[in-house]
Amino acid sequence: MSKSPDHYHASTHDVVNQPVALENYNLFEQDLALQAAVEREGAGQARDDLRHYGHWAGQAETIDLGHQANLNKPTFRTHDRFGHRVDEVSFHPAYHELMRVALEHGLHSTPWTDPAPGAQVARAARFYLHSQVEAAHCCPVTMTFAAIPTLQRQPELAKLWMPKILANSYDPRNLPDTEKNSVTIGMAMTEKQGGSDVRANTTRAYPVGQHGPGQAYELVGHKWFVSAPMCDAFLVLAQTDAGLSCFLMPRWRPDGSKNPWQIQQLKNKMGNVANASSAVELRGALAWMVGEEGRGVRTIIDMVAMTRFDCMTGSAAGMRQALAQANHHCRHRSAFGARLNEQPLMQNVLADLAIESEAAMTYALRVARALDNQSNEHERLLARPAPPVGNYWICYRPPTHAYEALDCIRCSGLMSYLLTPRLV
């Protein structure tokens, strides 16, 4: 039987000149600047591990995990069906899978558990690759990683908590930490009236018995912006008679009862939606003082410094992924008789994007080398101002960098089912 003519023109056109998806590639092997930086900063021994990690990060299935984690936002319920207060945030399985991979590969732990030469550089490079898949879930990974220097200021608490914090496993269940082999740590500092001016905090800490470092307190007040509220414990700032102090507050009490740390709402954020951020109230939440009473900012600043380091590394990762997406598009798209990446003006734009991306990554890994060499006075002095400086500039630049990358891709880059809108 002969084929009937298409009288109704059901097939109107052939799809041509559309780039294929950037997937099933190796993020490490295609990043020559990263390879050079890893060698230069002293982590050449991690090449094979980073190559394997780069392969995982570039697979279509891995990239889809990031998409699914953001497409399916976290949900919150205050009570279970029997009326018990649960304060439970539920995440899509894709979020949990990304968390599992991160923690099983030691993104929160390796420089602390195996402080060999180049450990911070190798971990930063791995975090850089991981963040390009999906950035939001990296928040609790970073906070867990960054909590260690602050906890070490209170040795008895560190001895109790660090084995589970540093375990290379992930347990997302809403259970007391005593029933889990691994835990994650969050941070709760800001309040409504002060924001980053944490010395204006009004949350109060009342001693249960004796007062001072390592002692138990009950916290009463609120925190206005708490990300990853399902972490198993939080480093919290609260006022005592001696001033602002730092506390470790678990979500569950030692007797297995729920600590009265009550989530009020999830923030309806712009972007970064896979990472739940919340407002909470503390109604006598049990916590233990970390560090010297009245020196809470000085105590928690060790954690803040390491979160700043990860924030600039993650921001550099976002810039790298924006560059990769723009470059891939321009290599496979033609206009006015030539590939976009052959057009002189486009070549200038792509070169500018590459220079800024590589500069951000280079800075981050140089700081990682300083963190690896704290016995050297020059490196120790460098490691103090470098994270906040990098956190300011590198974290400030990605939106503008992403806008320029999206301008290379134009309209198709703005679709929410793609990775690119998450980079803005």
Write out the residue ranges for each language-model feature.
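A glycine-rich, basic-preceded beta-loop-alpha segment at the flavin cofactor/substrate interface
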Residues: 255-257, 264, 276-307, 324-341
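A short, Trp-centered hydrophobic/proline-enriched beta-strand micro-motif
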Residues: 180-190
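C-terminal helix-coil-helix/basic helical segment that borders enzyme active sites and/or dimer interfaces
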Residues: 358-393, 399, 406-409
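Extended amphipathic alpha-helical segments enriched in small hydrophobics
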Residues: 308-374
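Extended, charge-enriched "interface" segments that sit outside catalytic cores
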Residues: 1-116, 135
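A glycine-biased, small/acidic residue-tolerant capping/turn segment at secondary-structure junctions
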Residues: 399-424
